[in-house]
Amino acid sequence: AVTVDDRRISGLILSIYDRTDYALDPQTAGALSAYETWRDRQKIDLPAVILNLDSPYRFVQTMAEALRGRGYARGRSRKVLISELEQEIGLAIPDIFSHMAEQDTIPLPTVKKGELSKTILEQLGIA
């Protein structure tokens, strides 16, 4: 088993963003970090595919702290953090998350069996 702490996840988010301008969400950053730890322990360079199936907009507080420093999100509303994240990464919040700006937690949408591809294409605006 591999464990990954919040500081490592935040560090990976910032490192990838600084190098590529890509805002990696915390869950995917955790998966990538766990893979890197496992690979280093095995002492092998095994290629992997890690799918990014989430959005940084589900984790605006974590994203703000990763990109702007620990404690940055304290006292700021989700609405403000979302606006700042949109400006920082140059990507508008997807419609699926826009109505959730005032909620503390954002549930994932439910997708019916056999409709995953269609749902992803719709969310990307290409269906």
List each model region and its residues.
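PLP-dependent amino-acid enzyme catalytic core
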Residues: A1-A127
